[in-house]
């Protein structure tokens, strides 16, 4: 429309007289209350509502930044995307929604058979939304494969004499200026007392070495969050991603922080950086533009933020 054309000319023309004409025209339209004409309605040019940090980080550490383990990697990858998710934005991909469903089914299942787990999935399938019947049929095939892979993993752990000591375990503790709170998918203990913390993912692949979520779970062990569940003496074997989205299940483990001092220092440094960033000490959240911005099946869909303030189709 006219407003869009004038706004585009205002920011693109190099001719000073044309810029002035566009500015005057927009001013007249703004006086007439035409939508989008007034600068107050232009995205990206308003000042901060407040320059204050979300959480004041006092020297006595009374100000605590609440951190959820599952959110730290998201913050590292793109602070702006994390901020949107933390304040109402959600990931609507099938993998994310089915992952939530599968976690609940696994928590409630009395046995680890395929029949039992798939029955649980079917009982909750109606909570998922699909755009078309063919889309639903495709996702059913994917879901069945994920359940099959999950059963394969559970059978493998049983053969290795690992037992489940906790599922959806609440962790809630202070770590410096951070208050850590979340739930751990699985806590398993091996025949020699070794404890493995497991995070179930519906992806086909994932890196574990510097995964901050796994690192925080290990720090939770070191802060005695699982003492009531595990048998003593116990050692921390590490934390692992359980990936069920591929042709077969796979695991990717992070080495024990109790045995890798360098990795432990790295994880604590990541948390310190997240504390400063999540509390908005610098009053901004950086947008790290990348492929995740426009991939609805990947990290998230932020394509709306990539749309220029003034667009024109002529």
PLM feature segments, named:
Residues 1-314:
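RecB-family 4Fe-4S metal-dependent nuclease core
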